[in-house]
Structures are given as C-alpha cells and as structure tokens.
Regions:
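Short glycine/acidic-enriched loop and turn motifs that connect beta-strands
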Residues: 57-61, 111-112, 160-161, 208-210, ...
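Blade-level signature of beta-propeller repeat domains, shared across WD40, Kelch, NHL, RCC1
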Residues: 330-363
C-alpha cells in the first residue's frame, strides 16, 4: 500500500460492537520493497513494551531489522540485526540463556541459522550458528523439549531432515537430534502437550501433499497423522477452540479451505471444521483472544487475497476481512503493542509495507 494512502485516511475495520482495527500513518514497518517473510514480537530492551523483529529476504539476501517501540505502539527507531544480509524466513525472540532478557534466533534458507544474544538493553550481538548450510529452514519452534529447564529449538527444513537442537544450559545449540523422515516438506512446527503427559509434543504443517504429523515427546519417534494425508499446509497453531479442555489444531492450507481439527480425550483428531475460502491461499495463521471474551479467535494471512480474522463464540466463527486486496501476506503475529491490553495484528507483506492493525475502542 502506498504511503499516500496512509496519509490521507485511517482505515478502520469493524472487529466487534465495541472494538475496531485501525491503521495509522506511523503503523508501518520497512519499505514497500522488502521481501518480508515474518515478524516476531517481544520486549527486547526491557522498557515494558513490545518490540518487533522483521525477517527479510526469503530466497534473496536482505538485512533483517529490529524496530523499537516508543511506548505508544509506534516504531520510529530501527537498527539492522547483524551486519550481514541473509535469506531469512523466520525470527524468534526467546530467553535462551535464562538471564532474563530476550535473545533472537534466525532461521535462514540455505544459510546456517543464527543466534543473537541480548545484553539486556536491546543490544543484540551475534553468538553462534546452528544447523546446516544446505538446510531450507522455514520455521523455528522453541520449547523445553527435554525437561531440563532450558529452551530448545525444533527446526522445520523443507525438503530435508528436521532437527531438534538441545540447549546446553548456556544458550548454545550444538547438540542436534533428527526427527521424522529425511525428506519431510515441513514449513511450520508448533509445540504443545497434546496428550497431557507432561512432555511437549511437536505438531507439523507439511506441504507438497505430504501428511501432517504430531510427534510425541520426549523421544519424538512415536507419531500420528492429522488432516487428509495430502494437504498443502503452510502454518499451524494450537489452542482449545471449543472450550472442552482438549487442545485443537488449526492449520492453514493452500488451494483448499483452512481447517480446525478438534482434539478428543482419546487422543484423536477425527472431528473437524473447515473455514475460509475453498481456494484459500493462506500462508500464516495465529490464534489469540482478539475481543477478550474468553474465546480463542483466528487471524489468517493470505497471498494475493484479502486477509481475514474469525471471531469465535464456540458455536461458530464470524468472518471479517482486513488488509490489502492484492497483498502477499506471508506472516501474521499478534500482541499488545500500545499497552491497552487488547492484542494488535502485525502483517508481514512480501513486496509491500509491513502493516500494524491496532485494536482500538471506537470513538
């Protein structure tokens, strides 16, 4: 979207009777030339508000950027993340060395993945590489996967071997364990205790017509499938969508409708609900309670189509549209950027401005 459009009007989207989404002239990140794949949110400089790391490049080398929140939800100051240009698909903010501040992990396409450690003030210094030069990393997922109190990383490598990198207790990822098949076309991994045994499990979204899997911790050998067995999935998130106490799986698909697979006490995911367009081009999906009514809602980012969010009342999903008509949204992230307790949406748009949609009270 051109900057002139931002300067001439504020586009408001009806979220519910008492909420709106609002685009502000200052609520954009990067340039309209960046090939942004995703964003991540967290308080990097310890000032109490959420900052944003933007993952740029995809297959082409660009610099990743860190945008610092001014306390009001605007991002006028930014720095490069490292000196290099990289082919980055994903960044994550997480405290990997248990020192109380957020560090940054970077997942790259056919370049080794990177770790940047934080000095507590938002100064991010390259620490070490992990992974392989030839890996097509598309997703990173962090959780304590072996129960030692430190954050590990599961890496989704499209058309290659997926790996878990275990934290050595000092924020280093040298110990690698492969899991799954040698040629899984994994794009995204979500971590959750799907079977309630106290260990984290890994939920995969695979493309290229491959089955989607759940790998059960702590060994990550036992697995089950969910979905049709031949989906073109791009993203996955996990939450209790119907309030029955069981975790459900929400998956984004290309060329088909997006799906919710409801968990049962038996550990199966046979009951499902389709939502979205029959020929969806959804690349990103994220769950959050947008209207703070106690139910988990869904935000989807589409390529070449308008984006949507779905408000959940446990019986049905109410669909709303937002974003550009022909934008290429590769990522959506959700968090309270302006400190009003309502979650805002950040869209990562390849070849366009990255846009913040503020969740506001109507005037």
């Amino acid at each position: 979207m051109r900057i002139s459009l931002f300067l001439t009007f504020v586009f408001q989207l009806v979220l519910a009777q008492d909420r709106i989404f609002e685009v502000h002239p200052y609520g954009r990140l990067g340039t309209d030339k960046n090939l942004t794949a995703s964003t991540s949110l967290g308080d990097l400089d310890g000032d109490g508000d959420m900052d944003i790391v933007v993952a740029n490049g995809r297959h082409w080398s660009e610099k990743n950027r860190v945008f610092f929140n001014d306390g009001k939800g605007f991002f006028r100051r930014s720095i490069s993340l490292g000196a290099e240009r990289n082919t980055t698909y994903v960044t994550l903010m997480v405290d990997i060395d248990n020192d109380g501040d957020l560090d940054v992990l970077v997942g790259n396409d056919r370049i080794r993945n990177q770790v940047f450690k934080n000095d507590g003030s938002g100064n991010l210094v390259f620490d070490h590489y992990f992974g392989f030069q030839t890996s097509n990393t598309r997703g990173l997922c962090t959780a304590d996967l072996n129960g030692d109190g430190f954050v590990d990383v599961a890496v989704a490598n499209r058309q290659g071997q997926n790996y878990i990198y275990f934290n050595n207790g000092k924020g280093n990822y040298a110990d690698a364990q492969p899991f799954g098949g040698p040629k899984e076309a994994t794009i995204t991994i979500a971590a959750a205790d799907m079977d309630g045994d106290g260990s984290m499990d890994l939920v995969l979204a695979n493309r290229d017509g491959q089955p989607n899997y759940i790998y059960f911790g702590s060994k990550f050998v036992k697995k089950i499938t969910y979905g049709t067995g031949s989906d073109e999935s791009r993203d996955v998130d996990v939450g209790d969508m119907d309030g029955d106490g069981q975790l459900d799986i929400v998956v984004a698909n290309i060329g088909d409708r997006n799906m919710i697979y409801y968990g049962s006490k038996k550990g199966s995911y046979d009951r499902s609900k389709a939502f979205g367009n029959p020929a969806a081009a959804t690349h990103s999906i994220m769950l959050a309670d947008l209207d703070r009514n106690g139910n988990i809602d869904i935000v989807v980012g589409n390529k070449g189509q308008r984006n949507h969010y779905y408000l959940n009342n446990k019986k049905e999903l109410m669909k709303y549209t937002f974003g550009q008509k022909d934008g290429d949204t590769y990522g959506v992230t959700i968090g309270d950027l302006d400190g009003d307790v309502y979650p805002d949406i950040v869209t990562a748009n390849s070849g366009g401005w990255n846009i913040i949609y503020y969740n506001r009270t109507p005037k």
